Regions:
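N-terminal export/assembly leaders
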Residues: 2-83, 116-118
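Short, acidic, small-residue-rich periplasmic hinge/interaction motif at the N-terminus
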Residues: 17, 21-24, 73-87, 91-95, ...
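Short, surface-exposed beta-strand/beta-hairpin micro-motifs centered on an aromatic residue
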Residues: 42, 122-129
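Short Pro-Gly-centered beta-turn/loop motif in secreted/extracellular proteins
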Residues: 49, 100-103, 126-135
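A short, solvent-exposed loop/turn motif at the edges and junctions
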Residues: 59-64, 137-150
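Short, acidic Ser/Thr/Gly-rich low-complexity loop/linker segments typical of extracellular
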Residues: 113-124
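Surface-exposed, low-complexity/disordered segments
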Residues: 159-289, 300-302, 353, 358-469
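Extended beta-strand-rich segments in extracellular/periplasmic secretory proteins, especially
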Residues: 277-328, 332-340, 375, 380
Length: 469
């Protein structure tokens, strides 16, 4: 039942949709044969914008699929091998001009819009977009490469995009040494200018894979909603709501089932080093890290400073080493690559391994992460989080050793400012002790139809094809 907040009476669905469109600047796209505007529904509207309420209203007894893309609300029936007519699709591959092959982790976004995706490890991509976006600029950008722009086509299309390396001949002012400590203090001072001061609602795709000795043993995927508080609300926490998910069948069962790694959508939604202040100096300029200036780079036609960091002391707790890329003009952190130091890896078992068994001896060997932010108006918004953790596992009973490698990636495919009163209710929130694979049901062959996700590579496609049989 819908949570009514205003006077109740039955009115045509079309009237409620018109009210929502005016109140929240929404544009509805749907097939009139599927969604009947003359059907009667309660006129009671929520006091604040609520995606879940709108989805429940529009899905109706037919259980229609409802997808939000920016201000577009797309409603359709999930049928095998088809998409709603309101959605178009551009797919293809991004290649390096030097002939080295497909480019992974290329940022793909509609200029001036929140909608976006990314290439997979083979450089392949699919972007689904509303017809209302036809003719707008689709931008392909990657660190160290010249960006390319295309107009979004009127029909489903296939693109082959070739990105050229930057020939870096930067003006003298851009290559002069910059004091890294002063640079990091300027990053701290400009946080309020560079990152949202209001809460946001993010739509994200999350994939988690586990390999045992280079063979997939567990694959899980999900679309989630994330409530991200203001970057100035330091003590408020993110909330995650599960939308849809699937898991793939694997050729072998995971032999070591008694341990689970720290991860999942809940934890990766909180891996925001800018909002958490990780690796940054405090307001007085003090830091637990030593900063090293490493030159400049280019991304999306912007000059980026490269600043390395390493802990001043590495004797207790967990510390990282890595590199930040900072936008020269705005002083915003736009990319972070970091990993646990060797000493911290040796201390990390109790942190990384959430469930264990006395039968197994687990030893983490690497834990590395990547974060990226994308520009939106005058601010930067979290765009992508990727984590890789490898462990050596010794089965004491079988006297067998295995190498387990898990890769988790979260791609923010859409976002919008949220009303300050709107939060994901605790009853709907993904809990910290949830394990993603345990929350998913049977395989859904139509999972890809409505959402922007990172395309699976060839090995993963085989895993999911097994699930269709």
């Amino acid at each position: 039942m819908l949570p009514a907040q205003e006077k109740k009476e039955l009115v045509p669905l079309g009237a409620v949709m018109d009210s929502l469109a005016l109140r929240y600047d929404l544009d509805f796209a749907y097939d009139a044969a599927v969604l009947r505007r003359d059907s009667l529904v309660s006129s009671a509207l929520p006091k604040v914008f609520d995606k879940q309420w709108i989805s429940t209203l529009l899905s109706g007894p037919q259980n229609l699929e409802v997808v939000f893309m920016g201000q577009q609300v797309i409603v359709g029936r999930s049928t095998p091998g088809s998409r709603p007519s309101a959605l178009l699709e551009v797919s293809g591959r991004v290649l390096a001009a030097d002939g080295s092959g497909g480019l992974p982790m290329v940022n793909i976004g509609v200029e001036g819009r929140a909608l976006g995706t990314s290439t997979n490890d083979e450089g392949r991509f699919v972007l689904r977009y509303p017809r209302a976006y036809i003719g707008e600029a689709l931008v392909f950008s990657s660190l160290g490469f010249v960006s390319e722009r295309f107009s979004l086509p009127q029909n489903d299309s296939v693109l082959e995009v070739v990105l050229k390396n930057y020939s870096i001949h930067l003006p003298e002012v851009q290559v002069l040494y910059t004091d890294p400590d002063q640079l990091m203090r300027s990053v701290r001072r400009r946080l309020a200018q560079n990152y949202p001061s209001e809460p946001f609602l993010l739509t994200a795709f999350f994939r988690e894979t586990i390999r045992q000795d280079d063979e997939y043993v567990e694959v899980s995927e999900a679309v989630v909603d994330i409530y991200k508080p203001s970057y100035q609300a330091g003590f408020a926490s993110e909330r995650v709501r599960f939308v849809k998910g699937r898991k793939g069948a694997t050729a072998r069962d995971m032999e070591v089932v008694q341990f689970k790694l720290l991860g999942g959508p809940f934890h990766f939604a909180q891996v925001d080093v800018v909002r958490n202040g990780d690796f940054l100096p405090d307001e007085e300029g003090f830091s637990a890290y030593r900063y090293l200036y490493k030159g400049v780079d280019m991304d999306n036609d912007r000059v980026l400073y490269r600043v390395g960091f390493e802990p001043l002391h590495d004797e207790e707790g967990l510390f990282y080493r890595g590199e930040l890329r900072i936008d020269k003009e705005s002083r915003a952190v736009v990319r972070v690559d970091f990993e646990l130091t060797p000493a911290s890896i040796r201390r990390s078992r109790s942190y990384l391994v959430r469930r264990d068994s006395r039968r197994f001896r687990t030893r983490p060997v690497v834990a590395r992460y990547h974060l990226a932010y994308r520009p939106w108006g005058q601010h930067w918004v979290l765009s992508r989080v990727r984590g890789e953790v490898s462990l050596r596992v010794n089965d004491r009973d079988r006297r067998q050793r295995s190498l387990f490698a898990t890769v988790s990636e979260m791609l923010v495919s859409d976002f919008a400012p949220a009303d300050g009163q709107q939060r994901i209710p605790w009853s709907e929130a993904y809990r910290s002790d949830y394990v993603l694979s345990e929350q998913l049901g049977t395989f859904d062959p139509d999972f890809w139809q409505f959402y922007n996700v990172v395309e699976p590579d060839e090995d993963l496609r085989r895993v999911f094809q097994e699930g269709e049989r």
